[in-house]
Amino acid sequence: MFQFGKKITGAHEDGIWCVKWQGDIIATGGMGTKVKTWHGNQPQFLTERKVFDKHILGVTSLDIDIGARYLATGGMDGTVRLFDLSTNTLHKTIDSGPLGCLKIGFLNSANNLVSVSESGNISIYSVETGEKLRSISNTNKQVLTMAISPNNEQIAVAGLDGTVLCYDVESGRRVSEIKAHGVPIRSLCFSSDSKTIFTGAEDSQIRLHDPNSSNPYIASLLGHSSFIFSLVASSNGDLLASSGSIDRKVCIWDIKTRKLDSSFTAHADQTWDLAFSPDSTKLVSVSDDCSIHSYALKQ
C-alpha cells in the first residue's frame, strides 16, 4: 500500500502536463513555457533545482535519459529542446514540424530520441547532432499517445480509432496491430519486461495486451470514472499507476493480481501525468491545479 506524501502547491504558474523521474532528477512541464527540475532524493526531495525557459508555447512531453545526462522537452511551438543536465545548458534545438511535438522519448540510453507529432509522424533524431536519422511510416494519422518498450525494440502509438500500432525500431516495420478499445486511447505504456502493453482510454478502462499474441487482450482494470490520461509501469515490474481526468484519481495497481493497491483523490483538477521513482517505492503526479503530489510505499 502507498500513502500520501509531500505536496508542492504552485509548482508552476499554469497547469502541469508532464513529469519524468530519472536518478535524482524530477522534471515537469506544462501549459506554460517553463520546464523545471526538482530534487528526487531526501533531504531536498521536491525542492526546485533549475528552471529552463526556451519554448514559446506549452510543453506537451519530456523525458530524461537513463543516465540522467540529458533532458528532452517537446513543445507546441514545433521544437524539441535538448538540455545538458551536467551544465544545465541548452544542448540542441530540433525542429519537429509545424504541428508540434506530441510525445518524445529517449532510445538506447541517450544516443537517439523519438518524436511523434499530432499528425502521426514518427521521427528518430541523433542526440549528439540533433539531425534526423530516419522516419517510420505510421498509418495512424490521429495519434494521441506513444510509448517506447524498455528493451528499445518497439515504438507503440495509439489514438482516436482505439487501435495500437507497434513498430520495430530498427527496421521501421509494423509488427503488430491491436484493436484495443472502441473509443480513443489517451495513454499507453509497456511493462518493464516489454512483454505487455497497457492502454487507457476514454471508456475509463485500462486494458492489458500481449502484442505478440494473435489474441492480444488479457484483462481489464476498472477503477476510474473518466478518461485515463496517464499510465506508467514501475521498473521492478510489480506496479502500474494510472491517472484520470474529471475523476482526478491516482490509482496504483498490483500487476500480478490485477487488483487495486491504492487510490488517491488529492488533486483539485484533472491529473495529467505520473512518474515512479527509479526504485519503484515512490510516485509523483502532476495536474492542472499547478501542483505536484508525491506518494510513498508504506514502511
Swiss-Prot record:
Tree of life domain: Eukaryota
Protein name stated in the entry: Superkiller complex protein 8
WD repeat start-end pairs: 11-48, 54-93, 96-135, 138-177, 180-219, 223-263, 266-299
Gene Ontology CC terms, in alphabetical order: Cdc73/Paf1 complex
* Family (UniProt): Belongs to the SKI8 family.
S-S bonds: none
Q: Which UniProt keywords apply?
A: Repeat, WD repeat
Matching InterPro entries, A to Z? SKI8, WD40/YVTN_repeat-like_dom_sf, WD40_repeat_CS, WD40_repeat_dom_sf, WD40_rpt
**What Pfam families does its record include?**
WD40 (PF00400)
